[in-house]
Amino acid sequence: MAPKKFNGFMMFVNEWREKTAEGRAASLPQAISKCGEKWKNMNTQQRGPYNKMAKNAEVAARCQVERLNCHGQSLSALEREEMEAAERELNMKRTTERIVLAGKKRHDLESTKFIFAAFNYFTKSMTNDIYIPAEFSACQFSLKSGICSMYSSHIDPGQLIFGQGSETMHHTKHTHQLPLPPNAMGESDIGRLYANIVEYLRACNPDAKPNDPLVVFATPEFMPIVKGCFRYLESDSEEPLATIHIYDIQYLLYVLKLEVLDSVDIRNVTVNRTATDSLFINDYFCYHLGISCQYHEDIDRCQYCTQSIISRWCYVFSDFMCGDLAITPLPGKHMPPKQEPKFRVSNPGNESVNSSRISSNFSKTTNKSTGKVSNETFTSGQSIVKHEIFDHSAFSADLNAAKDFPSLGGRKPKPNRNPMGKDLAPGDPRRAWNVPASKCRVKDFEDSFKMPPS
């Protein structure tokens, strides 16, 4: 729709229609015809105020206040942000698909390498999306080799955001439990740490050009954290060393699974985004030992260690796709390293275990009176172990027998079981249960005050 134009003549017409009785009764065409003759007889000085009013109205129309939502935010700004977010997500998906299809085109999809990264943080700024980092881990992964390399470091930011100490203590206490500054562990030179991280990421992409952006993957939960922590590290650097893009690892798993099935001629019938996303949500390798840093191993917080987090992501990829490509999983690369159990399970009822560990003579007796079957194992040098097997499905009891249900016979009769209107005639309306208290006699309430004998 073309913008509305203002001129001095129409301002004169509107004023004449508002201030004169004849103008209020006339329609717009009649007012234009009537005012046209007057406008022709007016000189430039007389037309000046109306031309000025037209210019002011045009300026005011350009400076109209934008529509706001209930939070006082501009609707146009929100729509623009939504469009930008949708465009970023579309670019992310296209780039992820391009990386996977490039490996498929080379017929080397199992050797295509990806970089996974995760941050732990102390606190988040309330005014922007900057996080104060506490720990960083990144690894290079491929389906064929598993975890190729890993970079991990604790971070000492030196100081926290003023006024957010309580929030920081609450967050760290319920997550990674790393010591707070000034007692924080790890690298304190943020500029050097950022340079080392960029150097490692570039080493994982030897074919990339110096000006190409670096692509790392993280879950949607960690994507804003990784972005905010990289912004914090970059702020202490003299100049930006690289452009780092953080993409969705869940979408990478979905696309990679589809291309793996297509490369081995397996028709996709069950793979969808919900199925692949649930693998990260369930986190089946969450409580495995030996995949986190030594500090979190000692305090038993392996679940929140970034080294453990990225390792579990790699294990999810391997567990979900190595079987399709006939890749033999290796402990520590495609699956958690094997751990010697620090406990012993003893089950005397397991006949196969008992017979394999020791030589024993097994006898079976049946008690006809009770219907119980008892297994007795006699072992030289050991005490006799007895285990009785009960058939809980075969149960019969008498509901009136006190020995089967002893609680039934222990119940006492309730006192004052007689109704309030026991001495009234059958037709008396006061025998009704809902008679108001004002219409009842004192005698009706006698039973209510009789206490049972102690």
Swiss-Prot record:
Keyword set, alphabetical order: Cytoplasm, Developmental protein, Differentiation, DNA-binding, Meiosis, Nucleus, Oogenesis, Repressor, RNA-mediated gene silencing, Transcription, Transcription regulation
Main localization, broad class: cytoplasm
InterPro entries the record matches: HMG_box_dom, HMG_box_dom_sf, Maelstrom, Protein_maelstrom
Keyword Repressor: yes
Segments of the chain annotated as binding DNA: 2-69
GO-annotated cellular components: cytoplasm; nucleus; P granule; perinuclear region of cytoplasm
Biased composition (Low complexity): 350-370
Domain of life according to the entry: Eukaryota
Region (Disordered): 336-374, 405-433
UniProt-recorded Gene Ontology molecular function terms: transcription cis-regulatory region binding
Compartments, as annotated in UniProt: Cytoplasm; Nucleus
A Pfam family reported for this protein in Swiss-Prot or TrEMBL: Maelstrom
Cysteines paired by S-S bonds: none
Single biological process term from Gene Ontology: oogenesis
Keyword DNA-binding found: yes
Function: Involved both in the piRNA and miRNA metabolic processes. As a component of the meiotic nuage, plays a central role during oogenesis by repressing transposable elements and preventing their mobilization, which is essential for the germline integrity. Repression of transposable elements is mediated via the piRNA metabolic process, which mediates the repression of transposable elements during meiosis by forming complexes composed of piRNAs and Piwi proteins and governs the repression of transposons.
Similarity section: Belongs to the maelstrom family.
Name of this protein: Protein maelstrom
Source organism of this protein record: Drosophila mojavensis (Fruit fly)
